[in-house]
Amino acid sequence: MSALALASCSSTNKVTKDSDNATRPDNAYMDIDSKFLTFSNDQRATINKGNTFAVNLFKTQIDKQSKVLSPLSVSFLMGMLANGADGDTQKEILKTLGVDDVSLQALNEAYRALLNSTATNDKQTTINIANCIAADKHFSLKRDFQKTVLGMYDANVESLDFSTSKAVDKINEWCSKQTNGMIPKIIDQLSAADVAVLMNAIYFEGTWEAPFEKAETKEENFRGYTRDIKRVQMMHQEDDFSYLSNDIFEAVTLPYGNRTYSMTVLLPKEGVSIEEMMKQVDAQKIGSLYRDMQKCVVDLKLPKFTTSTEVVLNDAVSKLGAPSIFNGTANFKNMSDANIFISKMLQKAKIEVSEEGTKAAAITAGMLSLIHI
């Protein structure tokens, strides 16, 4: 499973092999993922195809600020939308996800397997993936659609009165509960045209297999994109890690708990920007990292940080191949007989990295609204 949370953080990082003491300012790409969950060959192939969407979506968000993003959360939402779409709209969604050569049933089964995989035997790692549809009590969703999203995505449909503020409160309460309070709300209000909100929530909490010693955390320089320097708490340890170095970047993997999940950090080489690095990175190369990494002693410095991001994804998803879901040409006839479209797709995400481990959460919401002709 790729990209539970992705972050681009500006920092003065140090990822050096053996006794090399060179420290340099640059920016890092971080990926929380799992390599050891069990899927069928078909499910694994479908999930791997979706990893291309994950990397491409993250690339649309690279700018001059630190970002945290969960492409997996967006993928679950898009999967539910694919089941409600028809015609060209459905084709666009599947192509954007990189699974246009896969049946919708196969896609659903892959997401079902991902949901089932969250029940691990690792007592040091918690992961929760949840889906939900909040619908106005006057809006009708087709029964077959409701049956599919419940059976394949565990997405219950909750009927609410969208004309009252209690509907907003209920939606935000669900978000807070599913993310253990990390994302307390996703929306402030509902418009008169809104008829439903499709939501995915992801929560991750993991303890490092090798925690950082708090006594080793020191205040050190932190350099951002604008080259300004500020002082931050920098964690430090020297230990055996899976490590790789090439002409573009260095990479190190930090496992959690019993190694089911891990964080991989990519640090551009001196003189290489994160934008230049990401141009050279695709899903296939990220996948090959784990095959090419070797165990060695790594002198690692990593900022102790908390960062959060709120982003509207309409433009990004449109550019990646699914513009029709956001305009009057949207076809969601497998979801409802009403003329509806996604007026807004937004995500809130947050990550906390400390000496003990990592907490990360994301909510992705698709606002379904009536098309006024």
Language model features: what each stretch is:
Residues S40, S70, V99-A106, H236, ...:
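General structural signal for secondary-structure boundaries
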